[in-house]
Structure formats: C-alpha cells, structure tokens
Swiss-Prot record:
The chain crosses the membrane at residues 449-469, 547-567, 577-597, 623-643, 656-676, 699-719, 731-751, 830-850, 874-894. Induction: Expression is the lowest in vegetative hyphae and the highest in conidia. Expression levels are increased in appressoria and infected rice leaves in comparison with vegetative hyphae. This is Chitin synthase 3. One of its GO terms (molecular function) is chitin synthase activity. GO terms for biological process: ascospore wall assembly; chitin biosynthetic process; septum digestion after cytokinesis. Residues 1-15 have a biased composition (Basic and acidic residues). It is found in: Cell membrane.
Amino acid sequence: MAYNRLDDDYFDNRRPMNNRPPPHRTPSPGHPLQHGYQLDDAPYGRPGLNSASNLDIPMGPGRHTPSDQLQLHTAHSMANMSEPGYQQQPGGYRDEYSVNPEQHHDAYYNPTYTPTPNEAQTPYGEPGYEHDGRPLLPQQDSYGQYSDNPQQQQQQQGGLKRWKTVKRVPLYMGNLVLDCPVPPKLLNQFPHGERDEFTHMRYSAATCDPNDFYDEKFTLRQRLFSKPRETELFIVVTMYNEDEVLFARTMIGVFKNIEYMCKRPESKTWGKEAWKKIVVCIVSDGRAKINPRTRALLAGLGVYQEGIARQNVDDKPTTAHIYEYTTQIGMALKNDVVQLLPRQQPVQLLFCLKENNQKKINSHRWFFSAFGRVLNPNICVLLDAGTKPGGNSIYHLWKAFDLEPMCAGACGEIKAMLGTGGKNLFNPLVAAQNFEYKMSNILDKPLESAFGFISVLPGAFSAYRYIALQNDKNGQGPLEKYFAGEKLHGAGAGIFTANMYLAEDRILCFELVTKRNCHWILQYVKSATGETDVPDTATELILQRRRWLNGSFFAAIYAIAHFYQFFRSDHSFFRKIAFFIEFTFNTVNMIFAWFAIGNFFLVFKILTTSLGDETLLGTTGKILGVCFEWLYGVSLITCFVLAMGNRPAGSGPYYLAMIYFWAIIFCYLLFAAVFISVKAIMADAQRGLSVPELLKDQVVVTLILSIMSTYGIWLVASLLMFDPWHMFTSLVQYMLLSPTFTNVLNVYAFCNTHDISWGTKGDDKPDKLPSVSTKDGAGKADLPDEADLNTMYERELAVFAQKHVEEKKALTPSQLDEKQLDYYRGVRTVVVLLWMVTNFGLAAVVLSTAGLDRITPNTNAETKEQRATIYMAVVLYSVAALSGFKFIGAMWFLVVRMFRGV
C-alpha cells in the first residue's frame, strides 16, 4: 500500500520522481519538493498493485482543502511506530473492548528505542544506505490483512517490538515534534475522511519550563490549521496516580458536556461544530507516578503511544511529553470496568505527561502559562480526576460568564458521591460530609455569591475567565500570586506563607477580586454540579482536613490583613461597602472557629453541671457529670498526644475510638439539653402559664432560638432550594460527628501547622557524575597532560599560601530540610500554646475556675450562674445572628437566580 497526497494537482502519477527542485521555488506544505514517499509496493510514478488499498493521508491544505486542514510541515512524520498495547484481531474489530494495561506497564520503563538492532537485517538494507525520503515503515504492509491465527501472531510478535531502522529525526525550530499514525485498530473504528487530526497523533517533547513554552517556539495543533481554531472552552483534568475508573468517571462527564453543546444548534456559540471550540487537557503529575491502567486507557483513546517519548533532545532533558489527538472514542463504566465505545462525538485531547512529580500547582502552570498562552482561550475549566461533572454542568458554568461580562470565576455545587441507591450513606463519615457539603452549597456559597466574592472556588470543579487571570505588564497579578506557592521550598519560606499556599485557590480568588483597576466578581452557579469521592475512613479524613483547615485559616488571615487591596480595584463604592460587610462577617466566623474547642467545652460543662441540680437528676447527675468530665478530658488529651507525635495512618484504631467517645459525649449533651428544657416547660405548665407568659421565660426563649437558628434555618433553606433530602438522610450522622470535627480535626490541624506537604513527594535524584563513553569495550575519558598537572599542583599550593578566611558554605538540601522542619516545629509549639491558653482562659473567666474563685472569694453561686447564663445567651444570639445573615444572603441569591436563569 502507499500513502498518497490528497487534492494536490502538483503531483502527477505519470511523471517519474525528480528530487531536484525547480528554479526559484522553495518547499511549501502544500507542494513539497518531494512529491511522495517511494514505497516498495508503489514506486514513484506508478500506482500501487492494489490502488483500492491505498490509504489517503492528507499532507497539507490543497486547493479545495477545508480551512481546518492540518499542515504537516510543522512536524516530522513518523509512520508505523510500534504499538504494543494492541493485538491484531482477525476478522475486523469489535465494537466495544476493554483496555489491556498490563502490556503497557510491562514495556513502559524500557528504553524508547534500541540504537543497536538485535536482528541482523533491516527492511531496507544497511542503515548507512537508508534513503532519507523513505518513511519509517516496516517491509510488511501494516494496514494489510490480519493474521488468521492470533496465537501464532502473538508468538511472532513476542514482547515490545522496535523497528529495525534508526533514523535521524530533524528538529522543528529546535524542538522534537512527531506526527505518528494511530494504530490501525483504532483508525478503522470510525470514519476519518481526510482529517489527519483523526489519523495522526502529534507528539512534542517539551524541554523547557512551562513559562518558556511559547517563547521556545512550541505550539499546539489548534494553531496549525489553515484557519487557526479559536478555543472558547479549555478544560483541564489534573491527575496524580488515579486509577482508570476515577479517570473515566471524569472523562465521561466531560464528553457528555461536549455532546450536549454540540446539540444546541440555535446557540450563537455552540452547535454541530462546537467540539472544535473545546480542548480537553489532561495533565499527569509524573511519568513514574501515572497509573499504568490509566495510561493504557489514554492509549485506547488514541492520545498516547508507547515508545514515542524521548528522554533528551540535544542533551536537553525533557520536562513534559505532550500528546495531541482528536478522538472519536467514548467510554462507559460497567461494574467498574471501563469500556471503549467507537463513533462518538469528536473531542480534541491534549495529554501532558510531566517527566517529574512536581505537585498539582505545577500542573496548573503547564495549563495556564504554557498551553493557555498558545491557545488564548476564553474560559478555563478546572477538574480533578475523579470529579464527575453533570451532563450539562460545564455549559452552565460557561453560561454564567456569558451572562455576566465581569464574572472572573465561577464554581458549581460539589456533591459527595453516594453510590448506587445512596449506599455510601451507611458510612457515617460519608453521610456527615454529605450534610456538610450540602449546607455549604445552600447557605455559604449563595451568601458569598450575592456579595460578589466567594472565598474559595474549589479546584476540583471551577472555571475562570482567562483574560482576568493575566498579570500586568510588570508581571504582577493573580497568576503570579497563585504560582508563588510552587517555589516555596527551603528554610526561607515562612510557615505562615507556606500554610497559606496549601489553599492557593483562596489566594487566587482574593487576587482576582482585588485586581488593580479592575472590577471582577465571582459567582456560584447552582445549576452546575460535580460529584466527587469523599474520604470514607478516619485516616483519610484527618489528612485531608489538615490541609484544608490550615490552608483556609492562614489564607483567611491573609485576606483580612490585606483587605485594603480592595481599594486599588475599580469596584463601585457600594460594592466595596458590601465587601467590607462580608469581610466583617468572615472575621467573626474566624473568631468563633478559633474558640470552637473552648466554646464546646463550656457548653458541655454548663449543661452537665446543671443536671446535678436537685430538681433534675440530683446526685445521679453529679456522678454522671464527673464521669463524663473525665471522659472528655482523657479524649481531648489523647487527641493532642496523637496529633503531636503519631501519624494518622499508624493510629487508625485510636482515632476510631476517639470518634466513638466524642459521639457518646454528644449524646449525653443532647440528652442534658432536652431533659433540662422539658423539665423547665413542665414546671411552667404546672404553674398555669399561658403561651405569651411562656414566651417570656428565659429557658423557653433560649430553647426556641437555638433550635430555629440551626435546624429551623437548615430545613427552611433546604426546602426553598428544593434540596431537602440530606436533612433526613445525613443530619443525625452529622450531629454525632460534629464533636469530632471540632476537637479531633481541629486539634490535629493546629498541631501540624509545621507540615506543609500535600501528601505527595517529588522524585529527588542524586547529581550525576561525569560519564564515560564506551565503544568496543574501550572507554574514553579526558585525562590531564603534564601542563595540566603542573597547573593543578600550583593551584593547590595557593590554597594554603594565604591566611584562612572562613568560608560560608551553602547548606545541603538535607540540611535545609532539617532546618526548615526545626523552624516549623518551633512555630507549631507557639501556635498550639497560644491556642490552648486563650481557650483555657475563656473557660476560666466564664466559670470562675482555675484560681479565679480565690481572687474574688465573695462571689456567690448566683453571680457565677448569672455569668454563665449571660455567656450562653451571647453565644446563642451570635449563632442566631450569623445563621440569619446567611439565610438572608441565600434568599437574595435565590431571587436573583429567578431572573438570571442560571
């Protein structure tokens, strides 16, 4: 078979091949000097033996070529590279098949090519006589008929095959760029016509930093069409070592969204060709870290091929391997098995496989600074592998930007994945997190959206306007602040800044809204939903919340301390007043979060002590109070001990016991509150008080206020949002685990402020020693001659010829790490002590304990009781006011949404 150029009148099959160029003509992509590759089955000037079997592959825009025809002059065409992940199937192809990842894994760490072929013969003779115009093709027709005996074929193929000819691949603009034909098994599953974006995968070996990608003349396929494609939506899926099920879950949701937008023919932006305006970027954090099964799935989609990547280009190490392909293969999940479905909606895929593990923020830098600068998209959507967007959620996110020109960022509702029939709700940890997520999306996010500033747009599912992210001409701006956290390593990084950048998405939100001379706002889009897995074990939950709590706490302090930056923005006076109100609200919330552990103990102490009253439980109440106080103290001390010196992974049973202890304590608290309230109401009823008189009773008013400010507002807001089911399926679990959130998670987070890790570590490699080149068993090395020996000797003499001056040596990386860790531990001690002392002081002042009763010995019991009552009233009224404020904001969001439609 042969490759023929399509729609090219310049090529005449009746003429013999003439490599000499006509005078005054330079090569062009449409009419190259070489009119075709001379193949054994179709020499120059003659058609093949079977012209029907010729595969037409376009080589550039011809006279009648559509505007989206690719130009292949920007890449070196590599034909028929080995594809080990697939076995040829007799009798055609199956409509559906699963990925076989083991073959990819077995061959993944093999060298990318074999410089010295094992076989004695090559397809075209000796390598020294290889014709430069011949493509890398095996002698056998790779697109021919398949073997009728698959077992025999498998034996012949053996392991991973490497083509016998080693060719010199020219560089384009100093960069290695290859256009590689996709496997025949993949190609024949869908109609591809003349589009080489379907027939070829493009590989680029990036040998630069993401910030230099554009300047180093790297480009992407969308800019290589005759009419470069405009990118409206640029979607990134970041992953580390997620398996193929989690990855497929995300990609299925993305594919459904693209299909939904292609089915909107009346839209001015979308329609049948909408997929050309959408690029899906997959960034994997580390070549050694990627899950081999996920890598095999990417190969199944056509966007990855084994054996193509190169470690170095001209002695420059490759930093990222970039694969581009427009796939027509879909996916389906059946019983946690991924199946590939052919003939689906085309999707432009960009797969970036980073050479080293450099954390998620570096993956985002590749997305924004490298690829975003090339494509210049309108809207960027951020997804984590494992988060499944709803069938039209990405469209609704985009619509929010379309309706509001000043919207710089938007997020949707993050849902906890509950499994089939809600089976995951049987796990109390999942149910409690489900309730937490729901109430945050019903009260917190709508309130912040009503003001125009959302404290955090979750990186798992959010979107940004690309132009709003850009830095100013001085290099300062949102992206500059966002990526500053990537460089924080070593003792020079302060613990405050290091913890703050554990929640770098919060910093990005703050920098967007306060951008100089701009008036960008952030919005919450309830119509956009994304499902994600939540931790289902205590160990995973503790580790996750450590980063969340520390990052959000220090980022909130940063935002409050830099509130003055709002005045550099171009927001209106009333918008700035609204921001001031919101930040005041956030400050009050942060103060309550700081004193949460002290407030919880005070409520516990007051209620359990009250049960010892003679009108209630009397002596029994006193005994129970002492027992539960001891249980409380032991549990809290245990939490501190575990947090200060143990890893959660090695203390799972202890933390599980703590969860049960705190749940028992909460049950006793709930019993005390209900019992005291019922006794008070019964006493009032026996005195014959009317309803108006009952409402004047302090106990009754406190009871009603506390219930309505929490459960009442939760229920009403959930009903108004048409999402009340979590109140019936997850409320009890959340109540039982709320002491765990307050005590266990907060204690572990504050006791580990020195730990600024994300849970993943980079691949630190030792420095390489000078190498020795060997040939025929003999090594070559640079050895000094006599003159060099003399020079070196004189230099040694000069070292001690003068007085010794103390030289400050740079610390080694291990010493820097140890110094940094010691510094962080010291600051951790100060933070924990300050936190404990302030909370203990609050409890001592309210209860007149810890020696304060000796300072004021004349204080009677009635005064102490009155002080405790006043404190309880302040707490309850504050909680009620904060909840009411959230409710008002959520209602305003609901009213605005009725008119906006999003």
